[in-house]
């Protein structure tokens, strides 16, 4: 991608405050803006498969699987000048582009269909990813792989009514915590973790087809 659009680094108050002085935005202490000065290249591959198994009088099983592996690197940064003491796209932002998402992802699912029943189990695995410190490589952190399981059980009645119950992230999986970072004494999670840090979500639902 040439001229890829991405957010800049966060500009500190020493840069931002003088710019907004005397305006309604004088209380702003930091800012970032969109820029398109980076050129990137992504290489990788994706695989997908499907298999259907008939169970005779016990319905049918549908299996699906997928695997994707990608690598993105910055091939060039346009020279558009600089802000004293700051980089427009610095080490942290470059890390978000190159290492901020998992290098690979695996998805597996099985769906059992029998009369009005439908039971689906889905599994996702996110590979390792990294967060770079803006100034100190020694503070970079590599986050381990994460497995997430979903479950949905539903029954459809003849009249069009469907009852469902299930869970997203059934086993309450969480990503690795940020090393040394806490908010009010509670360990923090990275905002770029692929599955978030909300944990398990359980639900029931009712739907009707007219």
Predicted feature descriptions by range:
Residues 35-40, 140-143, 193:
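Outer-membrane beta-barrel proteins
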């Amino acid at each position: 991608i040439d001229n890829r659009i991405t957010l800049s680094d966060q500009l500190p108050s020493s840069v931002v405050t003088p710019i907004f002085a005397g305006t309604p935005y004088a209380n702003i202490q930091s800012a970032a803006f969109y820029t398109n000065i980076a050129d990137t290249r992504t290489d990788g591959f994706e695989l997908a498969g499907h298999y259907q198994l008939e169970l005779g009088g016990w319905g049918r099983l549908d299996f699906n699987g997928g695997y994707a592996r990608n690598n993105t690197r910055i091939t060039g940064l346009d020279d558009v000048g600089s802000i004293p003491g700051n980089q427009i796209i610095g080490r942290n932002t470059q890390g978000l582009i190159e290492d901020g998402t998992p290098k690979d992802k695996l998805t597996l699912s099985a769906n059992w269909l029998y009369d009005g029943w439908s039971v689906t189990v889905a599994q996702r695995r996110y590979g390792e990813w990294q967060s770079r410190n803006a100034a100190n490589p020694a503070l970079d952190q590599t986050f381990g792989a994460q497995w997430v399981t979903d479950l949905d059980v539903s029954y459809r009645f003849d009249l069009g009514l469907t009852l469902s119950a299930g869970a997203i992230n059934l086993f309450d999986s969480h990503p690795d915590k940020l090393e040394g970072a806490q908010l009010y004494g509670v360990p923090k999670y990275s905002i770029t973790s692929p599955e978030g840090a909300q944990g398990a979500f359980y639900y029931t639902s009712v739907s009707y087809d007219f």
